[in-house]
Amino acid sequence: MAFRGIRPSNKVAASRPDVWTLVNQATAECKVPPVSLSQGFFNYNPPKFVLDAAKKSIDEVACNQYSHTRGRPSLRKALSEAYSPYFKRTLNPDTEIVVTAGANEGFFSVFAAFLNPGDEVIVMEPFFDQYISNITMNGGVPVYVPIIPPEEGSVKPVSAGAWKLDMNKLRNAITEKTKMIVINTPHNPLGKIFSEEELNEIADLVLKHNLLVVSDEVYDRLSFVPFVRLATLRPELFKHVVTVGSGGKTFGCTGWRVGWLIGDESLIKYSAAAHTRICFAVNSPCQEALAIAFGEAEKHNYYEEYKSSYKKRFEILAKAFDQLEIPYTIPDGSYYTMANFSKLKLPKDYPFPEEIANRPRDFKLCYWILKEIGVATIPPTEFYTDEDAPVAENYLRFAFCKTFETLEEAARRLQKLKDYF
């Protein structure tokens, strides 16, 4: 009998090629190496004090063995000391913090801990695409509520804060099956920071309907405007919010895969239980290195210099967009910006591959700019449902977590677009 293959789970069988695979494949096929402003990883090393901490940790005997399933005590203590002032309470490192294998495993652990089949999770569009698979693999049902772009965003630069959550749709999206809401602030891909007014409206609904919130705050150290945490708005909210953080985003070491969850003991104990079954423990030397890094960051004035350098990085792209008269979002936080290419005229009969030709216009923009201009970006309709994708089909997402030289070269190459307006 001929071998017919093993059928995959329905959880993955229906998956179409994701945007990361498509962009990476197209990038690899380029004759001239493109400048990559696509994925949100850094193309330079973490600061020396962070690297020194990692080198020191790898020589420690205990750091080469399993850590406590909830995370190394040194890192949980460092996180408590670093975040207690922001949460306006003393965070218990033993019961209110758990270290995870990157922020993504943190999300997965919360969904695994609290979702039953058919439970609904409200997700705001555009969304980080990993949310969706994490929800559905744990039996949840995503329900989408759009963040609406400002009308003037297609003709001039606008603040990311001008993109507004449709509160009426959020209210109407809540049903008896709703279990959770996912919030991302500072937002990927918009760079939006939700205002205190917006968060209070969300808080009213959370308390009224007894909902759990997963608050993705992995870019919290890159906030260029006042940053408010939902969990701190009212004392009772702490028991409704699990906050997700990232060592990789905070210190420029995304490959270390160390994240964390912060929340009330009643939430963390179940998330920690799921985390233990998913990966048992997180790599020890990188945890210890981050514990040291948190302790030394203020001494090196790291956070202020981090923000200052990213404002300068964004200014390189903003200047290039201004020269091209391309509208863009001015981020409130994070290291992403969205630029609007509605005026760019794609050549007729361009040979787009089938997997690109059948997708919205931003995929074609992304592919063409990659192949002809040599700059890699991300098409943001990947972060929307098919129904709402037209909202973003003229935009591209740029990640500016790159060296100044990389950004300057990207800006130079982008000037070639003048011939296509």
UniProtKB/Swiss-Prot annotation:
<keyword id="KW-0032">Aminotransferase</keyword>
<dbReference type="GO" id="GO:0047536">
    <property type="term" value="F:2-aminoadipate transaminase activity"/>
</dbReference>
<dbReference type="GO" id="GO:0005829">
    <property type="term" value="C:cytosol"/>
</dbReference>
<dbReference type="GO" id="GO:0005634">
    <property type="term" value="C:nucleus"/>
</dbReference>
<keyword id="KW-0663">Pyridoxal phosphate</keyword>
<dbReference type="GO" id="GO:0005737">
    <property type="term" value="C:cytoplasm"/>
</dbReference>
<feature type="modified residue" description="N6-(pyridoxal phosphate)lysine">
    <location>
        <position position="249"/>
    </location>
</feature>
<dbReference type="InterPro" id="IPR015424">
    <property type="entry name" value="PyrdxlP-dep_Trfase"/>
</dbReference>
<dbReference type="GO" id="GO:0005739">
    <property type="term" value="C:mitochondrion"/>
</dbReference>
<dbReference type="InterPro" id="IPR004839">
    <property type="entry name" value="Aminotransferase_I/II_large"/>
</dbReference>
<keyword id="KW-0808">Transferase</keyword>
<dbReference type="InterPro" id="IPR051326">
    <property type="entry name" value="Kynurenine-oxoglutarate_AT"/>
</dbReference>
<dbReference type="InterPro" id="IPR015422">
    <property type="entry name" value="PyrdxlP-dep_Trfase_small"/>
</dbReference>
<comment type="similarity">
    <text>Belongs to the class-I pyridoxal-phosphate-dependent aminotransferase family.</text>
</comment>
<dbReference type="InterPro" id="IPR015421">
    <property type="entry name" value="PyrdxlP-dep_Trfase_major"/>
</dbReference>
<dbReference type="GO" id="GO:0009058">
    <property type="term" value="P:biosynthetic process"/>
</dbReference>
<dbReference type="Pfam" id="PF00155">
    <property type="entry name" value="Aminotran_1_2"/>
</dbReference>
<dbReference type="GO" id="GO:0016212">
    <property type="term" value="F:kynurenine-oxoglutarate transaminase activity"/>
</dbReference>
<dbReference type="GO" id="GO:0030170">
    <property type="term" value="F:pyridoxal phosphate binding"/>
</dbReference>
<keyword id="KW-0963">Cytoplasm</keyword>
<dbReference type="GO" id="GO:0006520">
    <property type="term" value="P:amino acid metabolic process"/>
</dbReference>
<protein>
    <recommendedName>
        <fullName>Uncharacterized aminotransferase C6B12.04c</fullName>
        <ecNumber>2.6.1.-</ecNumber>
    </recommendedName>
</protein>
